[in-house]
């Protein structure tokens, strides 16, 4: 059990879920690079299921001047979300930012999912929505005390329903709505809530998503010609957090699609269908 460590007056403490790879790991590296050498430095709490991968990220961030705490966490389990926050407070006594990044993708036509396999829809909701809800609820008193920041990494699939992503879109729409409502609740408390909407990003989540059977799909099913580098994606999310922005919509197509949806929803539905590879489109 880590011992309590008082942060220096200028040190900020950030929690990142899903920090073992992809966007979460890159945000950790960029935060360490930006603040690690500053007076007071930065404390990073890195959470995910893989202890080994988390430690590798922590080693890199430590080399950049950050102080790191690794907490192995499955965000689909409420008690582990609470333990993540408890360990952070025991170690540092404060939380300045919570980045809800942990998530699982999925690519499956709803008609191809058997009734006996629908349980993975519920599990996806536990990871993508409830993990963020539980972590945020546990951290909220400390974030209020620090007048800190909450980041929710949603998806363009949380703004526009994407064919083949009924489960994933459901979780991300729910996440979008939850944090939109929470933002209004926390305005007077001085806690910012930034929701990020990445499109296709070059990370392993593309191939680690679930198929109709709830098994690893091995492919995103999406065209990836315009996929964003993970470094750019992480930088845009962190910029939104620094500026305490309400939302960060990543791509030009995403911004355009969101606007067009209000006036011509059928056009956006065709755009979403055209984003799929031909072999995964409904016949």
Predicted feature locations:
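Conserved glycine-rich Rossmann-like NAD(P)H-binding loop of the short-chain dehydrogenase/reductase
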Residues: 34-57
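Residue(s) in the substrate-gating loop at a strand-loop-helix junction
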Residues: 155
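Conserved mid-core segment of classical short-chain dehydrogenase/reductases
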Residues: 105-122, 164-167
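The beta1-alpha1 cofactor-binding region of Rossmann-like NAD(H)/NADP(H)-dependent oxidoreductases
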Residues: 52, 72-83
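Active-site helix of classical SDR
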Residues: 136, 171
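Conserved glycine-rich cofactor-binding loop
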Residues: 20-21
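SDR active-site lid
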Residues: 188-252
């Amino acid at each position: 059990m880590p011992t309590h460590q008082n942060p220096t007056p200028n040190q900020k403490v950030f929690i990142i879920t899903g920090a073992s790879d992809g966007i979460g790991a890159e945000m950790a590296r960029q935060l360490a690079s930006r603040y690690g050498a500053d007076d007071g430095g930065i404390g990073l709490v890195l959470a995910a299921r893989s202890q080994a991968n988390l430690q590798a990220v922590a080693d890199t961030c430590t080399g950049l001047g950050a102080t790191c705490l690794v907490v192995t966490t499955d965000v689909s389990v409420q008690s582990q979300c609470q333990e993540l926050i408890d360990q952070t407070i025991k170690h540092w006594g404060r939380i300045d930012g919570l980045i809800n990044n942990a998530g699982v993708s999925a690519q499956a036509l709803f008609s191809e999912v058997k009734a006996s396999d629908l349980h993975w829809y519920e599990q996806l909701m536990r990871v993508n929505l409830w993990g963020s809800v539980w972590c945020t609820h546990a951290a909220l008193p400390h974030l209020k005390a620090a007048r800190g920041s909450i980041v929710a990494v949603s998806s363009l699939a949380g703004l526009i329903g994407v064919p083949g992503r009924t489960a994933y879109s459901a979780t991300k729409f729910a996440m979008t709505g939850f944090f939109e409502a929470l933002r209004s609740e926390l305005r007077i408390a001085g806690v910012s809530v930034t929701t990020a909407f990445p499109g296709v990003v070059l990370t392993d989540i593309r191939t680690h998503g679930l198929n109709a059977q709830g098994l690893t799909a091995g492919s995103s099913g999406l065209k990836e010609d315009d996929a964003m580098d993970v470094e750019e994606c992480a930088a845009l999310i962190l910029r939104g957090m620094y500026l305490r922005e309400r939302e960060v919509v990543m791509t030009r197509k995403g911004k355009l699609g969101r606007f067009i949806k209000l006036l011509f929803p059928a056009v956006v539905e065709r755009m979403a269908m055209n984003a799929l590879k031909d072999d995964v489109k409904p016949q």
